[in-house]
Amino acid sequence: MRVLGIDPGLRNMGWGVIDVSGTRLAHVANGICHSDSGDLAQRLLSLHGQLTDVLARFQPDTAAVEHTFVNKDGVATLKLGQARGIALLVPAQAGLAVGEYAPNAVKKTVVGVGHAAKEQIQHMVRLHLPGVALAGPDAADALAVAICHAHHVQSSGRLEAALARAAR
């Protein structure tokens, strides 16, 4: 299974692709979609195009997006929410199921604690994906989202199998 993880952002939208085979995770690629300052509609269009290119190039089977947090600046929060909409829309347009995870859930899955620092996330992503060259903190976060989704899908599959066995 190939998983695309997305860390939404208006200026820098991180993405990471991993392959999952059983409990084995393998890094495929990671990067950052950038948008320049200026007209919001053009920035969103740019992010849409870049993320669409990532999907076309790497052909993921599923995707996952990190929830955004609300901060004191309402305008910034709304703009971030619009970028997150692009992060949800592009994989959905490609027919993919899209998982959504809170930042604390991602950190808890990858690092072991829900309030981990960026450096801890990057360190643990490197441990999960040996040899990975991270394009930046946003790409590391996106890979962490992909790892979280892979673990969640595996756990859900094991639970469904156990319930099916118990029902027999």
UniProtKB/Swiss-Prot annotation:
The processes (GO biological process) annotated in the record are: DNA recombination; DNA repair
Which UniProt key words apply to this protein? Answer: Cytoplasm, DNA damage, DNA recombination, DNA repair, DNA-binding, Endonuclease, Hydrolase, Magnesium, Metal-binding, Nuclease
What high-level taxonomic lineage is stated for the organism? Bacteria, Pseudomonadati, Pseudomonadota, Alphaproteobacteria, Rhodobacterales
- Quote the Pfam families the UniProt record gives: RuvC (PF02075)
Residues at which Mg(2+) 1 binds: 7, 138
Instruction: Give yes or no: UniProt keyword Nuclease.
Output: yes
Quote the cofactor binding remark.
Binds 2 Mg(2+) ion per subunit.
Q: What class of enzyme is it?
A: hydrolase
Catalytic activity as recorded in UniProt: Endonucleolytic cleavage at a junction such as a reciprocal single-stranded crossover between two homologous DNA duplexes (Holliday junction)
List the CDD domains hit by this protein, alphabetically: RuvC
Its localization reads: Cytoplasm
- According to the UniProt record, which cysteines are disulfide-bonded? none
- The highest taxon in the source lineage is Bacteria
Residues annotated as binding Mg(2+) 2 are: 66
Record function comment: The RuvA-RuvB-RuvC complex processes Holliday junction (HJ) DNA during genetic recombination and DNA repair. Endonuclease that resolves HJ intermediates. Cleaves cruciform DNA by making single-stranded nicks across the HJ at symmetrical positions within the homologous arms, yielding a 5'-phosphate and a 3'-hydroxyl group; requires a central core of homology in the junction. The consensus cleavage sequence is 5'-(A/T)TT(C/G)-3'. Cleavage occurs on the 3'-side of the TT dinucleotide at the point of strand exchange.
Query: GO cellular component annotations, sorted alphabetically?
Result: cytoplasm; Holliday junction resolvase complex
**Could you identify this protein by its name?**
Crossover junction endodeoxyribonuclease RuvC
Gene designation per UniProt: ruvC
**Binding partners and assembly:** Homodimer which binds Holliday junction (HJ) DNA. The HJ becomes 2-fold symmetrical on binding to RuvC with unstacked arms; it has a different conformation from HJ DNA in complex with RuvA. In the full resolvosome a probable DNA-RuvA(4)-RuvB(12)-RuvC(2) complex forms which resolves the HJ.
EC number(s): the record gives 3.1.21.10
Gene Ontology molecular function: crossover junction DNA endonuclease activity; DNA binding; magnesium ion binding
Q: Which family does it belong to?
A: Belongs to the RuvC family.
Question: Residue span of the signal peptide, if any?
Answer: none
